[in-house]
C-alpha cells in the first residue's frame, strides 16, 4: 500500500474529538442517561477519549463500554476461510435498556460494521436511542446509515483505503489515505 496523504494529524484529531464531545453534550442536553460504546478496537479508544473530554465539560464521568461485533458481521465467512473467529467479548458496565447509546467507531464506510454493532447491542438490551459518532466518514454507504457526529468527512474512491493510527495501538495519532 502506498500512502497518499496524512489527512488528520494529532492536533486535528484532538480538535475533532473535542468538537464531537461538545455536540454530544448539546444534542442530549447533558449526558445523563447516556452511555458511550466503542466498537472494537479503535472505537473503544476513541470512546474513552470522548468520555474524558465530556467529563471535563460536564464535570461528571460517563460510562464507556466495549462492543465486540465479530459474530454479527455479515462477511465472517469471507474473512475466516475455515478458521474459527477470534471473539474477545463485549464489556458494557451498565444495563443499556432505556439509555441513549452512542456507538463510537473510527471509520464509517459501507455501514455494515454499524449494522452489526446495532444487532449486537439489541442482544444486550433495548436502548431508548442509538446514536453514532465516528472520527472519519469516507462515504460509499451500502446501507441507509449515517453518523450523528463526524470528526471529518473524507471523500475517497473505492480504490483508496483510510488508516487510523491511535496512540494506544499505533504509538501515534493520525489518519492517512492509501492506495490499495
Curated annotation (Swiss-Prot):
<keyword id="KW-0694">RNA-binding</keyword>
<comment type="function">
    <text>Also displays a weak uracil phosphoribosyltransferase activity which is not physiologically significant.</text>
</comment>
<keyword id="KW-0806">Transcription termination</keyword>
<dbReference type="InterPro" id="IPR023050">
    <property type="entry name" value="PyrR"/>
</dbReference>
<comment type="subunit">
    <text>Homodimer and homohexamer; in equilibrium.</text>
</comment>
<comment type="function">
    <text>Regulates transcriptional attenuation of the pyrimidine nucleotide (pyr) operon by binding in a uridine-dependent manner to specific sites on pyr mRNA. This disrupts an antiterminator hairpin in the RNA and favors formation of a downstream transcription terminator, leading to a reduced expression of downstream genes.</text>
</comment>
<dbReference type="GO" id="GO:0006353">
    <property type="term" value="P:DNA-templated transcription termination"/>
</dbReference>
<dbReference type="GO" id="GO:0003723">
    <property type="term" value="F:RNA binding"/>
</dbReference>
<dbReference type="InterPro" id="IPR000836">
    <property type="entry name" value="PRibTrfase_dom"/>
</dbReference>
<dbReference type="Pfam" id="PF00156">
    <property type="entry name" value="Pribosyltran"/>
</dbReference>
<keyword id="KW-0328">Glycosyltransferase</keyword>
<comment type="similarity">
    <text>Belongs to the purine/pyrimidine phosphoribosyltransferase family. PyrR subfamily.</text>
</comment>
<dbReference type="InterPro" id="IPR029057">
    <property type="entry name" value="PRTase-like"/>
</dbReference>
<dbReference type="GO" id="GO:0004845">
    <property type="term" value="F:uracil phosphoribosyltransferase activity"/>
</dbReference>
<keyword id="KW-0808">Transferase</keyword>
<feature type="short sequence motif" description="PRPP-binding">
    <location>
        <begin position="101"/>
        <end position="113"/>
    </location>
</feature>
<protein>
    <recommendedName>
        <fullName>Bifunctional protein PyrR</fullName>
        <ecNumber>2.4.2.9</ecNumber>
    </recommendedName>
</protein>
<keyword id="KW-0805">Transcription regulation</keyword>
<keyword id="KW-0804">Transcription</keyword>
<dbReference type="InterPro" id="IPR050137">
    <property type="entry name" value="PyrR_bifunctional"/>
</dbReference>
Amino acid at each position: 500500500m502506498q500512502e497518499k496523504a496524512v489527512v488528520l494529524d494529532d492536533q486535528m484529531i484532538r480538535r475533532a474529538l473535542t468538537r464531537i464531545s461538545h455536540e454530544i453534550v448539546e444534542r442530549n442536553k447533558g449526558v445523563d442517561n447516556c452511555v458511550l460504546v466503542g466498537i472494537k478496537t479503535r472505537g473503544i479508544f476513541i470512546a474513552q477519549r470522548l468520555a474524558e473530554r465530556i467529563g471535563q465539560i460536564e464535570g461528571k464521568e460517563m460510562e464507556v463500554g466495549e462492543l465486540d461485533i465479530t459474530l454479527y458481521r455479515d462477511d465472517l465467512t469471507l474473512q475466516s476461510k475455515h478458521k474459527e473467529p477470534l471473539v474477545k467479548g463485549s464489556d458494557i458496565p451498565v444495563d443499556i435498556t432505556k439509555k441513549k447509546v452512542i456507538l463510537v467507531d473510527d471509520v464509517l464506510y459501507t455501514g455494515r460494521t454499524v449494522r452489526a454493532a446495532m444487532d449486537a447491542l439489541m442482544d444486550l438490551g433495548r436502548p431508548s436511542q442509538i446514536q453514532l459518532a465516528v472520527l472519519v466518514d469516507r462515504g460509499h454507504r451500502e446501507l441507509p446509515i449515517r453518523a450523528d457526529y463526524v470528526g471529518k468527512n473524507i471523500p475517497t474512491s473505492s480504490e483508496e483505503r483510510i488508516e487510523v493510527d491511535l496512540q494506544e495501538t499505533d504509538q501515534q495519532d493520525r489518519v492517512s489515505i492509501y492506495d490499495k
